C-alpha cells in the first residue's frame, strides 16, 4: 500500500514540475530599449503599462532616469 502512495506522490510531483516548465514557455515580454533622447521631467508622468506597452498609438515604451515612459515616435 505504501508503494502506491509513493508512486502517486512522485507522479503528482512530476506533473507539477512539467506544468511549471511549460508555463515558462509563454511569450516573453519585449526588452525595453533606452530612450533615444533624454526627455524633460514633464514626460516622466507618461508611464508604460505593466506589459511594457503604450496606450496611445505612435508611442514607444523606453527607459530613462525616471523609469519606463512612453515617448512619441516622431
From Swiss-Prot:
GO cellular component terms, A-Z: extracellular space
Q: Which residues, if any, are the signal sequence?
A: 1-19
User: One MF term from GO for this chain?
Assistant: serine-type endopeptidase inhibitor activity
Where is the protein localized? Secreted
* GO BP terms, alphabetized: antibacterial humoral response; innate immune response
> Does the record's keyword annotation contain Signal?
yes
- Record key words, sorted: Secreted, Signal
Q: Does the keyword Cell division belong to this entry?
A: no
- What name does this protein carry? Protein WFDC9
Q: Which organism is it from?
A: Rattus norvegicus
Amino acid at each position: 500500500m505504501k508503494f502506491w502512495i509513493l508512486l502517486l506522490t512522485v507522479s503528482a510531483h512530476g506533473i507539477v514540475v512539467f506544468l511549471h516548465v511549460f508555463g515558462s514557455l509563454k511569450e516573453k515580454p519585449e526588452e525595453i530599449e533606452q530612450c533615444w533622447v533624454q526627455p524633460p521631467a514633464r514626460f516622466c508622468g507618461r508611464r508604460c503599462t505593466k506589459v511594457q506597452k503604450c496606450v496611445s498609438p505612435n508611442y514607444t515604451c523606453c527607459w530613462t532616469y525616471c523609469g519606463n515612459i512612453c515617448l512619441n515616435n516622431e
